[in-house]
């Protein structure tokens, strides 16, 4: 039996889809395409150069760059040389990068012109003094100036083009060694260490193996029934676990063609280039996250509104009609509804919807959604205009796909059906399996479950029990076996683009620096900003009222807001937490979280999902229109009940 490894996937693709385009990156001459066979050849050549640089078996290679062909080649090269890839998020702050590189014991660090300054600005924080920096771009004036600005010797940069030449020259010497490494690779060997969530000081490194990627890629293909040789523009960064598996590795199984957004000049340029790149790539499908689909919807609506009330009316009536016609996707309304809505739908389809689809290219058929929960209204909207979003669910620890909707099995408001080969159950707090329709923790088992957390046996044991991965997500299986994900059990914030972060350290910092705030639960469930629920120390608040001579509840509310940021003035917390995770709005809760109201458990920890459920209306206030005004009004009501200004 052939080993189920990344190598076997690339070997097969290099033969079956030899001359078909695999990776396409834009340059000054247009789109530069690399075929499947060329990708394998270039990867082995670069691997030979890595070995010449001193890379040894199980050595780590960190990658911090925007998506491009050489990013993918570099990961394959690391594997061919016997190493392990450590893909890093391009969204990391400069001060967040060193921990991940140091913790993973990286020997090589692959970066781009766009990420160079992020790295060399904190060069003294990297522990490996022999760490080699490899640049995926050609020498430029920008690179020279950045090195000069930070006192970094440009001679210490190694350019990938030079390494390709070294690899070609040393290929004969290293060819047998590379073949031996590939031959001896086991299914349970680690391919990547992906750092996810956690506070600045303690993110966890998720170890994913050859078998993890092999099984999840093949299961996704089998479940989705993906066609061969279709194309996509990969808008998501390649460090994103969803893009990593569904993009890089699923492409090997079915000969998919990947185009990368033209990010020359940085992130702002990348955003500007997406519309043109969408047309040029002629994508059949796109991988997306709710933040992206939400932005597209807003742009559509703004564009339609600008055309006047007549067109806007046709559009709105067409959307409403299509939503009624589509039902939930799984079961459609009857003939009466279809007949009643057909006129408004057809008018909007002919005049508007077909043109909206062309924005994504002439061949677009569907989106595959992941990374965060997708609001059902977004699903209804895209289905209405003829580009359904087939929402899935997963997490990096599961490589990441656990379930997905497909063109053949689709129900809006759900995350689809569990992939072939994965066992899924819903459990209560004591590990008992719950019945259909009953909410509990989503627990899974399969070849896609991670090997564990790097250098963190305790966290691994807490997450994987008897082979079952405890996701920390709450959900249930409905009567048709569709998985419905309803929220988090674990204490993780999730931004609108699916990025995750642990709130505990921020919460502790706020409580420890404020005399008034007794308890705080920071909240972000796929939103643009972070908010908080707080309970107050009544005596401390009364003291503040007297000491500060506070004469209005609006003034008191402002003081509480200032109390929330007191921690940032302390040296130990200066620039420690990324701004997006610090609450920008809050709601005062009258009653403390306690064991009596079941919002605190027996170990005195907050039961976050219960707090969220109980105060969902207060949380929603902070994300409503005119949220600051509405939240202030509600806070004043509570403060009036809690304390007196007399």
Report the location of each language-model feature:
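AMP-dependent adenylate-forming
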Residues: 9-34, 588-593
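Conserved AMP-binding/adenylate-forming core of the ANL superfamily
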Residues: 23-68, 72, 76, 93-98, ...
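Structural core segment of the AMP-binding/adenylate-forming
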Residues: 53, 80-166
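Conserved ATP-binding/catalytic segment of the ANL
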Residues: 418, 422, 432-437, 443-495
